[in-house]
A protein has these predicted regions:
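Generic alpha-helical structural signal
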Residues: 27, 143-147
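Short, conserved beta-turn/loop elements at beta-strand boundaries and strand-helix junctions
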Residues: 88-93
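Beta-strand/loop substructures that line and gate deep hydrophobic ligand-binding cavities in soluble
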Residues: 94-144
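Short beta-edge strand/loop motif at the mouth of beta-sheet-based domains
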Residues: 21-22, 41-77
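Short amphipathic alpha-helical signal-transduction/dimerization elements
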Residues: 146-154
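Hydrophobic ligand-binding cavity/cleft-lining segments
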Residues: 1-53
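Hydrophobic/aromatic beta-strand elements that line small-molecule binding cavities or substrate pockets
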Residues: 24, 57, 80-85, 97, ...
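Charge-dense, helix-prone N-terminal extensions
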Residues: 4-6, 17, 57-58, 62, ...
Length: 155
């Protein structure tokens, strides 16, 4: 597989504002990228492959519906879940994100899926982190995940 069609994924943490921004450009249709965000296909790329091994993913894809991911991280089981706040296929998706058992600490993830001349640009903004350390860790995770997403979706 050629990686010449992949624009490097980047994620930048803002520890003062406790938010992060991430972006990747992929030579794929917007609908294809959106589907990778909202289907079981997410298991192949999401949540820092190699560190978080996502094994199950389910969702009730509607505003107010819930999503749930589970797997193994560093030998221990993990669960992440949240609620869909806005769904506008294939342009925008917003959901909360929290660890199961920690609903008092949700962050909010906004995905913007935009066409551009060579394919699709995926911008992510995650806000509401409880600490700068958590924000920095998520930035590393998003960059790794987006690199994997780009590899999978390159024709």
């Amino acid at each position: 597989m050629s990686t010449s069609n992949i624009t490097a994924a980047r994620a930048v943490a803002d520890p003062v504002e406790k938010q992060l921004l991430a972006c990747v450009e992929i030579e794929a249709e917007s609908e294809r990228v959106f589907r990778a965000l909202t289907s079981e296909e997410i298991i192949a790329w999401w949540v820092r492959p190699g560190v978080f091994d996502t094994r199950e993913w389910s969702c009730d894809m509607r505003v107010g519906g819930r999503w749930r991911a589970s797997g193994i991280s560093r030998g221990q089981p993990y669960v992440q879940e949240g609620e869909f706040l806005e769904i506008d296929p294939p342009h925008k998706l917003i959901h909360t994100w929290d660890g199961a058992g920690r609903p008092d600490l949700p962050s909010t993830v906004t995905y913007l899926v935009e066409r551009f001349e060579k394919g699709t640009r995926l911008n992510i903004r995650q806000t509401g982190f409880v600490s700068s350390d958590v924000c920095n860790a998520f930035a590393v995770g998003w960059e790794t995940s987006l690199k994997r997403l780009a590899e999978i979706l390159v024709p």
